[in-house]
């Protein structure tokens, strides 16, 4: 498997700029330029790859660390809430994949659109959603981002260009192509990131949507988050050709180390520039989820604990940023631990506030069901009692 080969490589990013290797604390100048090299080269299909050299700053490094550790703490807390039966139904966690959400967000604006599948909590947070909105939604409360009606799989923040959160495998991709069509129709200089997993990569509708995007040169970026397992099925057992970045054939693609936030940032910056001028491109993010597929999956029956711990030790996205911050004397280990401690506190406070939010009124069952204006009648289970006329 390709993942085991990549594990043998030392993936820690290498600092290139001698000027910033001085022992002085760079935090005194948060805008100082630091040049880093991506952990691995980009592998490309029908396109010249971007440079491996990426510019950053102490401020951005610290922001990445804070954002990724906050996302991870949120997902760990969600795990505990689910086990305490405060979250019901489906719940898919994102810990391990944080570099994709954070790196992508660093390359785009809130006018660009993102649409994804059901592993959506961290994408929502990256788009500007709050922890209170996230936890309230997970617990089915009125103050949730979908008013407590969507749950884990249906987070939205339309005003920031986040269109969900979708529970049907692969069905979000055609919707994403529709968003890109609207952007081109309105002559906007923005793009849409349509995200899906390796488990959805064989869905027929994905190829149909990609063909349409290519035919009309739509500003669409298809992001395959390849965490190597579709539920419990390894990629090589489900796909004859698991090189998902080549799947478009006539559409260019890049394979990206999705555990390296700077590789993701560089690839997304490159992809946006390409899509605005030339149409769609595929980004395959080589990433890894630490939890099982969902809360009912222990995640250890189809992969070994050694495999999981090996990825944690050698490729963890948070530890990469921590190493880079320490190498450039931007912060001390104690200061980074203080940030993590503060994140823990912020998450705990958000959970407490979300618990105070009331449950939705039962009348909410009859809202947002049909397009307004049809006056559809809704009956009870016995079909005798008229419960409501839907607006």
Curated annotation (Swiss-Prot):
EC numbers, comma separated: 1.2.4.1
The organism of origin for this protein: Solanum tuberosum
Chain intervals for the UniProt region annotation (Disordered): 294-313
EC class of the enzyme, as a word: oxidoreductase
Keyword Oxidoreductase annotated: yes
Localization per Swiss-Prot or TrEMBL: Mitochondrion matrix
Swiss-Prot/TrEMBL GO biological process terms: pyruvate decarboxylation to acetyl-CoA
Name of the protein in question: Pyruvate dehydrogenase E1 component subunit alpha, mitochondrial
Subunit structure of this chain's protein: Tetramer of 2 alpha and 2 beta subunits.
